Regions:
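A conserved structural/catalytic subdomain of Rossmann-like adenosyl-cofactor enzymes
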Residues: 412-413, 417-601
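Short amphipathic alpha-helical segments and their helix-coil junctions
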Residues: 8-20, 168-189, 265-267
Length: 601
């Protein structure tokens, strides 16, 4: 779809199913096109079995011969697309849940379709039409719809090997959030709901990890199961999670959602494989629930997975590296780094004839020895710790601390595991913004960059003046990352564009140039962090060197990405320049005879 959208006239888009131009209304952009893609990519229905344009019509009343009701998405059991073969109706109108159910029920009553979906871009539900012996038509909400080729009774009978990898779960999390806000009993605050969803996501990830591919998963809800039965199975699953990861979860961690809400969430997520998802599932879930004011107030904006992957691939960590993210959030950079290193381990040691058990032991050893993360937000650091525990038993490397605080003020456990000058790789997207300044003389005087600086007229030199009363966190994180790195170590950091071009911040650029070799500056699109924030950012790649080892003249990889894989609203697009950058960097490195290893690690 995205490839052809540029060819449509203004105010129109290319319909994903039919390939024809349709008006770019909110319903089309946020619901019809989104669910059309879900039907094809996640449920496996062929486009030849789906009709969107021209719209299929059903009767308004039994006597209607014109068939006046237009159906947003009609799915058929064959390619003939007749009244007799209609199988599923999807209604995508901007109505509330009650009105949507009524209209969908009318469509199903007056057609031969037995299944219906109502989706408005933010909420969804699934209906099964049941005809009684006395001629009545009843509707039953069901946990999901069958995938292409499945029967109704196959819903929930999912084998681990049949789980599908999805490109984007944001619409699913949005639907879950809105369902819980309207229906959950007890918990209603988004922060509490987020914690409950995270608990269930960890149940899902644990189930994926420890279920054989040939066996049916436990994280499921069948067509005829009661919500209480589903809840009982999930409670047992969460008990197993807590037993295995006692260092992360406590007895106080319980699932407090009501049975119906638990069953709804399980039904929405059961078909997907979260471990292999292309996006950071936990970050997507958290961002959906924690509103803009709360996140923005703390400068917390999660890094898109394609940006994370690109930064990791450029720094190219290995099993002899020590990796840290001093603002790790929910763990995106450290999880991706661990995955990247693990892939190297598997490929390397399989060639050497190692057994699967030996490789597993090596992977766990690397997770514990080589990966560190810090975040001052308790909930986020707990998410990162749990994620690391379930993914690779690297839970001991994540700490809840203020990274900018004096290390001697950290807990003794943190001080044991994190030392200045120990790390060969730093990957981070620190919180930034003038609204969240770092204050306190004792904390600030650790940093040269916490001073005021005066430009020496007519030169590139700057003179250090008195200590400032406050400083933006992203500025101090540059210096803290320098302190964490060993000589020869490399860093990839997301920074606001002001750091690169603001004349008044020239002292920061001077600080960087005197202590690092500048390797790359990557300009990423304004849309990259939208819709959460519109701050324009770039990525800085540097290598810490002694001043005598920094060349006086050297090439720098400069890159401008025009697209980032989604639009300003967060809707997925196929155009993604960011995904190509790491391969372009590697070619540049070959052409310019550059290697981080040339300067030691």
């Amino acid at each position: 779809m995205a490839e052809n959208q540029t060819q449509s006239k203004e105010g129109y888009i290319i319909d994903y199913i039919s390939g024809t131009q349709v008006k770019a209304s909110p319903e089309e952009l946020e619901a019809t096109q989104v669910f059309s893609k879900i039907l094809v990519e996640d449920y496996g229905y062929p486009k030849t079995h789906i009709q969107t344009r021209p719209q299929f019509h059903v009767k308004v009343r039994p006597s209607d011969t014109k068939k006046e009701y237009p159906v947003d998405i009609a799915v058929f059991s064959d390619t003939e697309k007749t009244d007799d073969s209609i199988y599923l109706i999807v209604e995508c109108k901007k109505k509330n849940r009650k009105d949507g159910r009524t209209q969908l029920g009318n469509y199903l009553t007056l057609s031969k379709a037995n299944l219906g979906v109502w989706f408005n871009g933010e909420e969804r539900f699934y209906l099964l039409k049941q005809n009684t012996d006395d001629g009545r038509v009843l509707f039953k909400e069901i946990p999901n719809i069958p995938k292409f080729g499945e029967r109704l009774e196959d819903i929930g009978a999912i084998k681990r090997g049949d789980l599908i990898v999805t490109h984007n779960l944001k619409s699913t999390f949005k639907a879950i959030r809105n369902y819980l806000a309207a229906n959950a009993i007890g918990a209603t605050r988004d922060e509490v709901l987020a914690q409950q969803l995270i608990n269930l996501i960890f149940c899902k990830i644990y189930d994926e990890k420890y279920t054989d591919k040939k066996n049916i998963v436990r994280f499921r809800v069948g067509l005829n199961e009661t919500c209480a039965e589903v809840r009982s199975r999930i409670d047992k699953l969460f008990s197993d999670v807590k037993t295995k990861y006692k260092e992360v979860f406590t007895k106080e961690d319980i699932i407090t959602l009501d049975d119906n809400s638990v069953a709804y969430i399980v039904g929405e997520l059961q078909n997907y494989c979260l471990i292999d998802a292309e996006r950071d599932v936990l970050a997507d879930a958290f961002e959906t629930f924690i509103d803009h004011a709360l996140k923005g107030g703390q400068g917390q904006f999660f890094t898109p997975r394609n940006v994370v992957k690109m930064m990791v691939e450029i720094l190219d960590p290995d099993d002899d590296d020590m990796v840290i993210d001093p603002a790790c959030g929910s763990g995106g950079f450290i999880i991706e780094s661990l995955r990247y290193i693990w892939n190297k381990i598997v490929n390397r040691y399989k060639e050497m004839g190692w057994s699967d058990m030996e490789i597993l032991e090596e992977k766990i050893d690397v997770a514990n020895k080589c990966i560190r993360g810090i975040d001052k937000d308790y909930f986020l650091s707990k998410i990162a710790k749990a994620y690391m525990a379930i993914m690779g038993d690297g839970k001991g490397g994540v700490f809840c601390e203020d990274s900018l605080e004096r290390p001697e003020n950290w807990s003794s456990k943190t001080q044991t595991k994190i030392h200045f000058g120990d790390f060969s790789v730093v990957l981070t997207n620190p919180p930034f913004g003038s609204k969240i300044p770092v204050t306190g003389e004792d904390k600030l005087k650790q940093y040269e960059l916490a001073h005021k600086w005066k430009n020496k007229k007519g030169t590139n030199d700057w003179e250090k003046m008195k200590l400032a009363e406050k400083e933006a966190p992203q500025i101090l994180f540059i210096e803290r990352c320098y302190q964490l790195l060993k000589f020869g170590g490399r860093m990839a950091i997301v920074l606001p564009d002001g750091v690169f071009g603001n004349n008044q911040l020239g002292y920061i650029r001077r600080f960087i140039m005197k202590r690092f070799r500048l390797v790359a500056v990557i300009d990423i699109p304004l849309e990259t962090f939208m819709p959460n924030t519109g701050t324009k950012t770039s990525i800085l790649i540097v290598q810490k060197l002694k001043s005598e080892d920094i060349p006086s003249d050297y090439p720098v990889f400069m890159c401008v990405a025009g697209t980032c894989g989604h639009d300003r609203r967060g809707n997925i697009k196929e155009e993604d320049d960011i995904a190509e950058i790491s391969s372009q960097f590697k070619q540049w490195a070959v052409d310019n005879n550059f290697s981080f290893k040339n300067y030691g690690r």
